[in-house]
Structure formats: structure tokens, C-alpha cells
Swiss-Prot record:
The lineage of its organism: Bacteria, Bacillati, Bacillota, Bacilli, Lactobacillales. The keyword ATP-binding does not apply. One of its GO terms (biological process) is mismatch repair. This is Ribonuclease HII. Belongs to the RNase HII family. Its cofactor is Mn(2+); Mg(2+). It comes from Lactobacillus acidophilus (strain ATCC 700396 / NCK56 / N2 / NCFM). Endonuclease that specifically degrades the RNA of RNA-DNA hybrids. One of its GO terms (molecular function) is manganese ion binding. It is found in: Cytoplasm. A divalent metal cation binds at D72, E73, D164. NCBIfam families: PRK00015.1-1, PRK00015.1-3. PANTHER family: RIBONUCLEASE H2 SUBUNIT A, RIBONUCLEASE HII. Its EC number is 3.1.26.4. It is an enzyme of class 3 (hydrolase).
Length: 250
């Protein structure tokens, strides 16, 4: 086989016998390909192991024949736009290895995973609370209510919740996990759904309010955003109780 043919071979499923034969090949190009192949296989193995470890909390419920939903939020800190939450129920067949804390993933990776999560999950729902609600009841309570909204919108009722460091005001057993989106695939999937959903909302708002850069900053207080606030003032989606937006209402 040529080096090029071997390179193509190693991109697919390779048997131990084929690897053993390649190890006997004295060509330096072949040995370099094998070194690269082993590194990739090691990385893939470690990725699979980490993925399986993130089912630790889900398994506690699956073993009892119960469904558990992961719940997470995005958008607590921005000066503009809603807080968005997601509730996601997955089962033992869920196999999207790239699912992880949404903050660790590129926007492109999140966009690719979003439809796959919707397809593979048992049930997915989203909760949204806008700037007016946030200003009325504070961001923490708005966050909790949005989480409850997402859980109640699931078309299948879960037996319990895994939540990223929050308590959801619903009558269900809950496990609160600090940095839960890095410890549970259910919460990680919810973090991706919430993030992509909110980013799409902010892209839409960017078309309505083009001066603030919402499609780039998602409502966070970047220099571009603050400069636009100073020049144009706050919009309908700005949070009046968040500084420096609140300065415009004194």
C-alpha cells in the first residue's frame, strides 16, 4: 500500500491485524502515521471515558427506571435581553460525545450540536423571562421562574432534576450541582440548548436594534455596547435595574 492509501485507511475503522501489519512496515512515513493514529485513538478513548463519567448522576435514576431532566440557564449577567433556561431529558442511548459545558465549546460546535440534541433527547423545553420580569422580581427569581417554566413545558414529566447550582420552584426531587454543566451530560445538553436559543434571540434583536452589537456581545457590557448606550440610550430589552443602564433612569 502507498503512504496515501494507508493514511486513508487509518481514517476509518482499523482492525488489530491491520495495525500489526503496519507496525512491520519499515517506512518512516508509515510509522509517523501510526504515531499520529495512536495519539488520536488515545484522545478519543479519554474523551469517551470523560463522557461516560458525566452520566454518574443520571445513572442513579436510570437504575431505578426513572427519568431525570438536566436544567441550566444562560443570560444572568447581560445588560440586555432575557434570561433563558432549558430542561433536557436524555436516556442511556444518548451518544453525543461532544456535549459538554457550553462555555467550553465554540459557537460553531454549539450550533452543530443543537439540532442533534433536539433529535436524540427524550424531551427538551425552554423557559424565557424578559427584561421587564427581571426588573420586577430580580434576576435570581426570574432565573428560577424560567427554570420552572422549562421543566413544566417538558412533554414528559421527569421523576427528578439535575440543576446547575440552583433550586427550581417545582415539586420534584432535585440534585444541585456546582459547575453541573461540567459534571452531567443532561445539564451540559441543557446549557447548549439555552445558549443557542438565546443567541438566536439576540441575533433577532440585533436586527431591530442594530447599534448595540447584540449579535456579537449577546447583551453583555462590551465597549461597543456601552458606547451605543451612551449615544442612543437604552432599548425596550435593556434591564433597567442593571448598572450602567440604571443610570439612565435616575
Amino acid at each position: 500500500m502507498t503512504i496515501k492509501e494507508i493514511k486513508e485507511l487509518l481514517k476509518g475503522d482499523v482492525s488489530e491485524e491491520e495495525i500489526a501489519n503496519l507496525e512491520k512496515d519499515s517506512r518512516s512515513g508509515v510509522q509517523k502515521l501510526l504515531i499520529s493514529y495512536r495519539k488520536k485513538q488515545k484522545k478519543l478513548f479519554e474523551k469517551k471515558q470523560a463522557f461516560l463519567e458525566r452520566f454518574l448522576y443520571e445513572k442513579q435514576f436510570w437504575q431505578k427506571g426513572q427519568l431525570v431532566a438536566g436544567v441550566d440557564e444562560v443570560g444572568r449577567g447581560p445588560l440586555a435581553g432575557p434570561v433563558v433556561t432549558a430542561a433536557v431529558i436524555i436516556d442511556q442511548d444518548f451518544d453525543l460525545l461532544d456535549v459538554n459545558d457550553s462555555k467550553k465549546l465554540s459557537p460553531e460546535k454549539r450550533l452543530k450540536l443543537y439540532p442533534k440534541i433536539l433529535e436524540e433527547a427524550v424531551s427538551v423545553a425552554v423557559g424565557v423571562k424578559n427584561a421587564q420580569v427581571i426588573d420586577q422580581i430580580n434576576i435570581y427569581e426570574a432565573d428560577r421562574q424560567a427554570m420552572a417554566q422549562a421543566v413544566n413545558a417538558l412533554d414528559i414529566k421527569p421523576d427528578a432534576l439535575l440543576v446547575d447550582a440552583m433550586n427550581v420552584p417545582v415539586d420534584l426531587p432535585q440534585i444541585e450541582l456546582i459547575k453541573g454543566d461540567a459534571k452531567s451530560n443532561s445539564i451540559a445538553a441543557a446549557s447548549i440548548v439555552a445558549k443557542v436559543f438565546r443567541d438566536k434571540l439576540m441575533d433577532d434583536y440585533d436586527k431591530i436594534y442594530p447599534h448595540y452589537g447584540f449579535s456579537r456581545n449577546a447583551g453583555y457590557g462590551t465597549k461597543e455596547h456601552i458606547d451605543a448606550l451612551k449615544q442612543y440610550g437604552p432599548t425596550h430589552i435593556h434591564r433597567k435595574t442593571f448598572a450602567p443602564v440604571s443610570d439612565f433612569f435616575k
